[in-house]
Regions:
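Active-site hotspot residues in diverse enzymes, especially metal/ion-binding acidic/histidine motifs
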Residues: 1-293
């Protein structure tokens, strides 16, 4: 689908303001996700704000979706996110960031902050831009592009399609996001035109299939083995333990429990030997590093 417009930088600055004002997120980044780039850590971040259902559905274009305000324990509303793990890992990463934007209502913050009209298309564009800002922050991205750009530019300052695709693949590897995210980021930050972005995405005169084949070949040539690989993960946090409780207390029909275990490849819990409950000495080393200094 042809990209017809890109949100202005004022939207990006509003998104950055939201991120900087999100105290809970900043504390989580500092404690659990200290790396400058989130990459796959965004999946762990998403887990902290909702229940994530990881399950593969092959031959399905939908990368994932968000269900809000589902009645949970005690009747409290709860968020669920589905991630299609038959998609490649880099697509799962971007999907997780996108759905996190929905949970945080980033679009509503930006609309109010900038006084923009609330439309479905604009909201989705804002959420996609949020995912880009979260995973591909401007400062780091510019430094990354500038550090390798001379390797790919012609002497006249122009760049061939093949070299631009090489640059895209290198950036995909650094930020662990899909090709489309990098191409759009290059356009959002004015490295390339929207017309050229559509060219690379196969939305104009360039053959989309041939571009995708070339990108896959470059990924293999560069040794980026984590790309273009689906995880096929089947997991819901705490599902196994909850099934054990439901089975022990006869809360759910046994055939339903067996069916869920089969679908999620969950083995029956082993019978633990009594010595597994023995206690061992474990000495906390909190503050030990500071004391050494």
């Amino acid at each position: 689908m042809t990209i017809t417009s890109i949100l202005p930088m004022s939207v990006e600055k509003s998104i950055e303001k939201f991120i900087n004002q999100n105290v809970e997120y900043q504390k989580l980044r500092e404690k659990f996700f200290p790396n400058a780039l989130l990459r796959e850590d965004v999946l762990g971040l998403l887990d902290r704000f909702c229940t994530v259902v990881y399950f593969p559905i092959e031959n399905e274009d939908n990368n994932g979706f968000h269900i809000t305000d589902v009645p949970f324990a005690g009747g409290t509303p709860h968020n669920f996110v589905y991630i299609n793990t038959a998609q490649t890992m880099e697509k799962q990463v971007f999907t997780a960031a996108h759905e996190l934007g929905h949970i945080w209502n980033v679009d509503q913050f930006v609309l109010k902050d900038l006084g923009l009209e609330n439309t479905t298309e604009r909201c989705e564009m804002i959420i996609n831009r949020f995912a880009a800002v979260l995973l591909i922050p401007e400062g780091i991205f510019r430094n990354s592009v500038d550090s390798v750009l001379d390797d790919y530019l012609n002497p006249d300052g122009r760049i061939t399609v093949i070299n631009l695709l090489k640059l895209v693949v290198v950036l995909m590897n650094q930020f662990f996001v899909p090709m489309k995210a990098i191409v759009l980021r290059l356009a959002e930050l004015n490295y390339i035109s929207l017309e050229n972005a559509n060219d690379l995405l196969g939305n104009s005169h360039l053959d989309k299939v041939k571009i995708e084949e070339l990108v896959q070949s470059l990924i293999a040539d560069f040794g980026y083995v984590k790309f273009q690989v689906p995880s096929m993960k089947k997991w819901i946090d705490g599902l196994s333990e909850k099934l054990d409780i439901a089975e022990a207390q006869h809360l759910v029909p046994q055939e339903k429990i067996d069916h869920i275990r089969k679908e999620f490849d969950l083995a029956r819990p082993p019978v633990l030997a009594t010595e597994m409950t023995d206690t061992l000495q474990f000495t906390s080393q909190e503050g030990a590093k500071d004391n050494d200094n």
